[in-house]
Amino acid sequence: MGRLRAFLLFSGTLAVISTVHADFNCSQAPDSDMVQTCHMLQEWDSAARKAIRKRQAFNAGAPGVQGFSPSNPPRFAPSAQGCMNIACICPYMGGRMANGCILPNGQPYLMAYRKEYRMMSDNERQRWHNALIQLKRSGEYDRLSVMHRQVGSASGAHSGPGFLVWHREYMKRMEIALRMIDPGISMPYWDSVLESYLPDPRDSIMFGPQFMGMTDASGQLVSGPFAGFRTLEGRPNIIRRMATEGKMFTEQNINNLMAQNDLVSVMAFTAPQGGCPFRPYFGALEYTHASIHLWMGGDMKPPSTSANDPVFFLHHTFVDFIWEMWRQNHQNRFARENQYPPDIAACANSQHFSYAQMRPWDKINRDGLSNAYTDNLYHYAPRPTCNRNNANCGSQYLFCDTRGNPHCVAKVKPGGLCRGFEGLDSCYMGTCVAGWCRGGQQFQQPAQTTAVATVQQPQQQPQQQQPQQQRPATTPQSNCYNEDPCCNQWSRQNECRTNTVYMNRYCRKSCGLCQSNDNNRGCHDRHISCAYWRGQNFCTRRRQWMAENCQATCGWCNMNEAQLCASVARQSRRVRRNAKFWLTEPDADDFVDDFMLDYGR
C-alpha cells in the first residue's frame, strides 16, 4: 500500500498550498531565444491537454466489459531496450550469467561508460558510427526516432517535469539498441560548452567529417558518417541551419543549475497555467537545452523531426549527465528515487504527473528516477578538464585555454575561424594565423593520456564486434506477442473487427498485425526472458501477459488455453474490477492501471 499512502499524503500536501502567483507570461523570459522556447513549450502543453481530453472520450474495454475497464493494463512489451540491469539484457545478447554476463565470444558484457564525444579513441568513435549506421539500415533507428516524433508536441515528454525522466529512458533504449550490435560501445555525450568559447561554433571540429559532418549551402548534411541518412519525412539528407538563433550550453548555465537547491528548478514546470504556485525557472534544463536545438536548426529544431539527426542523442545524453550531476550533488539515494514535483494540473498537464504512464512504454514517470540506470546500466566519464600544470585535455581534438581559469575548448577545423586563439593549439592539423586555421602541424597534441585511461571497457573490447551473433536473439521474437491468453479465443469470435481499439493494442499477434516465428504447440515459453521475469515475480504481477507468453516457466502447464483464459486471466481482471476506484485528474485511467498493476493482481 506504499503507493496509495504516498498518493493520499501527497494529496494532503497539495491542499495546504495557498500562495498563487499571477498568471505567467512568456514575455518574462530573459531573451528572445527563451521567449521563443517558452511559446513552443506552451503550445505543446496545450496540445497535450487536448489529446488527454480526446483520449478520455473513448476508453477501450476488454471483450465483455462495458466502457472504462480497469482490466486494461499498460502495454507490457518486454525487450532488451526495456531492461534495467545486465541480468535482464544478457539473454537477449545470447549470453549466460556466470559472475556477470558472459557473451558467446567469452567476453564480459559491462556497464556502458559514456565519454565526451571527442574523448573517445578513434577506434571507439568509428565503432560507434558503424553501429549507428547499422541501426539505421536495419530500420531500428527510424523506429526509435518515430517514438520521439509521436511524443513531440502532445505528451509528458516535453513542457514539464516528465521531460528529464522520459529522455533518460529514451537515451537508455537507444544505447541498448546500439550495444546489441556492438556490446563494447557506449553512448557518447556532446559537451557543447566546449564550443561556446569559439568565435563561431560552426567551425568546431565537432562539425567536421570525422564527427558530425558538414553541410552544403542549402543546409543538407553531405559529409561525415551520417551523410545520406534519409529522414522520416523522406528527405535524402538531414537538414541543419546552424547559428541563425539559439546558443551553446555555457559553463554559467551549468553552474546556475548546480546552485539550485529546489527540485522544481530542475524538474521544472516549464509551461504553467494561471493558478500554478510555482514560477518557472528559466535556467531549468528544459529551457537551456532548447537553445542548442534552436542553434542547430533544421531537423533539430522541432521535436517532431529532431531525432532524425544523430546529434540529438549526443546532446540529450549530456542533458542527462547534467541532471545526474545535480542529483549526485543535492540528493541522497532515497531522495533521488522518491522526490518528484507535485502533481498540480495548473502547473503541468497530467501526463507529467508522477504516476502517469511514461508513454509509449510500460513505465510510469517516477520510474525514471530509479538509481538502477546509473547503478546497473551506465555511468559517465568526467567532463574534459585541464590546468596550468597539465595543459592537456586528453584528446587531439581539444585544446587547453590557459588564460584566466584554464578550461578545455573544441579545436577549430581546417579553414575555420580561430580569432582570439592565436598562439594556442586551437586548430586541428594546423595553426591559427591572423584569425584563421591554416594548414600545417606546428602544435602536436600527445596521444590520449591517463585523463581517459579510466575507461572501464578493457582493451579486448574491440574483439566483441559480433552483430551476427547478437541480432538474431532479438529481432525475430521480441515484438510480436499477445498480452492476454484470451486473445486467440477473442480473435475466433471476430473481436479483431468488432473491438479493434482494444484488440489492436493487446492482441496484435492473434489479429495478424505482426509476424511471430513461434510455431511451437503445447505448453512452452514464447519469450527468451521468462526465467528472468519469473524472478521479478511477474507470474503474479503480470499474470495475463505471463500466462500467454511464459506458461511453462510460471508452472501453468496443467492448463490448456481455454482454462488459462477462464481462470488465470479472468481472475486477474475480477480482482482489478473489484478494486476499481476513480480519480479526478485527466489521466486517472493511467494511475489506476499502474496502481493496480502492483497491488490488484
Curated annotation (Swiss-Prot):
Names of the cofactor(s): Cu(2+)
Xref: PANTHER family: TYROSINASE FAMILY MEMBER, TYROSINASE-LIKE PROTEIN TYR-1-RELATED
Xref: SMART domains: ShKT
Family: Belongs to the tyrosinase family.
Disulphide connectivity of cysteines: C480-C514, C487-C507, C496-C511, C523-C557, C530-C550, C539-C554
Tree of life domain: Eukaryota
Binding of Cu cation B, residues: H289, H293, H316
Cofactor comment text: Binds 2 copper ions per subunit.
GO MF assignments: metal ion binding; monooxygenase activity
All residue ranges annotated as the ShKT domain in the record: 480-514, 523-557
Organism: Caenorhabditis elegans
Binding site for Cu cation A: H148, H158, H167
Glycan attachment points: N25
Keyword Acetylation applies: no
Region (Disordered): 453-477
The protein's name in its UniProt record: Putative tyrosinase-like protein tyr-1
Keywords associated with the record: Copper, Disulfide bond, Glycoprotein, Metal-binding, Monooxygenase, Oxidoreductase, Repeat, Signal
Signal peptide: 1-22
